[in-house]
Structures are given as C-alpha cells and as structure tokens.
Amino acid sequence: MVSKSLIVLLLVSVLVSTFYTSEAYPASFDDDFDALDDLDDLDLDDLLDLEPADLVLLDMWANMLDSQDFEDDFE
C-alpha cells in the first residue's frame, strides 16, 4: 500500500515539474530547431538584450566548438 502511494506521489511530482518547466522554458517545447540559425543572425541590439546566463551559454558553446576533442569526434 505504501509503495503504491509512493509511486503515485512520484508520478504527480514529475507531472507538476514538467508543467512548471514548460511554463518557464516554452521554447524548449515549441519544436524550435532553428536555434543555431538564430545565433548566426544576432546583431548588436540582440547581444545587448541577452541575459548574463545566455552569454555564459554562448561562451561555453564557442569553447566546445573550438576544442580539439569536439573536432576529433566529427572527423
């Protein structure tokens, strides 16, 4: 009986967290596969509108593309 209650509670918590994630990050559920193309189209105004966390992610992405290990994976 306790295990069934625990499973139901876990399932409800997963559903609730999924709902809040879709509210916080709606673009992740909109089938937006052109994100890399959008990065190529950034101009100065777009860069000034970015949040600090976005800049950190862009920096991490650029470092990943520059790393030798990443290039070796696709040769």
Curated annotation (Swiss-Prot):
Tissues in which the UniProt entry reports expression:
Expressed by the venom gland.
Name where it's found. Answer: Secreted
**Is-annotated flag, keyword Signal?**
yes
Q: A cellular component term (GO) from this record?
A: extracellular region
Top-level taxonomic group: Eukaryota
Q: Which UniProt keywords apply?
A: Secreted, Signal
**Which family does this protein fall into?**
Belongs to the non-disulfide-bridged peptide (NDBP) superfamily.
What is the name of this protein? Anionic peptide
- Organism of origin is Tityus discrepans (Venezuelan scorpion)
